[in-house]
Amino acid sequence: MKKSLIALTLAALPVAATADVTLYGAIKAGVQTYRSVEHTDGKVSKVETGSEIADFGSKIGFKGQEDLGNGLKAVWQLEQGASVAGTNTGWGNKQSFVGLKGGFGTIRAGSLNSPLKNTDANVNAWESGKFTGNVLEISGMAKREHRYLSVRYDSPEFAGFSGSVQYAPKDNSGSNGESYHVGLNYQNSGFFAQYAGLFQRYGEGTKKIEYEHQVYSIPSLFVEKLQVHRLVGGYDNNALYVSVAAQQQDAKLYGARRANSHNSQTEVAATAAYRFGNVTPRVSYAHGFKGTVDSADHDNTYDQVVVGAEYDFSKRTSALVSAGWLQEGKGADKIVSTASAVVLRHKF
């Protein structure tokens, strides 16, 4: 009996050496407060306030790889939200995939982040709860950042350069909503630059609604030939961090009422931080210019400031204190929102 157990153990050793599985995740919870004041014709027309204990993006995941020989590996990941507020359900509701990795690069299929979403860490360095995302995060530019049921290829890095291409079929993206994505990256001696592009035939998203006996994808009703271009650049030496970002959206609107219309939307953002021992203070500013892809006349003008600091208790446990101010519109018609949060985070 003992010999059989020893034989089984020895037989399992090569398998354990070539197939690695990692459990990982993060628990993030804290207290947040928010206040929103809407002005109409120069007068206060609506006030909303609140405070709550909230989840700030907790998650849990499993990932692994298997050595297939000749430098080829099978890679996989299954990740899902794990809210401490008990509001996340289901498996694989975050980035989840299976693929192959080798000297040629990595190819994956599944629910994959787009190149736009991959640049988010250098655009939005903040975290928020359910009701404060528009104030405590640089969320205006992030509206086009999504995860797609798609296939994606990422190249190996060469002389600091790397790239990616991604395709989401129309049957996974709503009515005629197939999309194409491209990403280019460069890093050298702390300097970095990123480009991310999205090209979509009709709108974006996976939900549909019926309007005047026609079915449309939402949230981008009537949007045709959507393009999103984002440039990000900066410097990071593990103490000083600076980044700037610019995003241009462009679309043609379809439908009898909006024939031949063509609109664009431009937004910019910047972030600076410096690490003093265990403390890292940070500040971000974002601005949106007039006009959106849905309407050239829509006043999308906004200004936003987020300030805060992180304190590292250890490599895995940290705290974040932040406060944000957002003004949408200007003059007599505007919405002014403020929010603050204290968050405790642990990664495993």
Curated annotation (Swiss-Prot):
GO molecular function terms here?
Answer: porin activity
Q: Which GO terms describe its biological process?
A: monoatomic ion transmembrane transport
The record describes its membrane topology as: Multi-pass membrane protein
The record's subcellular location field reads: Cell outer membrane
Q: What is its main location?
A: membrane
**Signal peptide positions on this chain:** 1-19
- Entry keyword set: Cell outer membrane, Ion transport, Membrane, Porin, Signal, Transmembrane, Transmembrane beta strand, Transport
Recorded hits in SUPFAM superfamilies, A to Z, give: Porins
Q: Which GO terms describe its cellular component?
A: cell outer membrane; endocytic vesicle lumen; extracellular region; pore complex
State the oligomer form and interacting partners: Homotrimer.
**Main function:** Serves as a slightly cation selective porin. Major antigen on the gonococcal cell surface and it may have pathogenic properties in addition to its porin activity.
What family is this protein classified in? Belongs to the Gram-negative porin family.
| Name of the protein described by the UniProt record | Major outer membrane protein P.IB
Q: Which gene encodes it?
A: porB
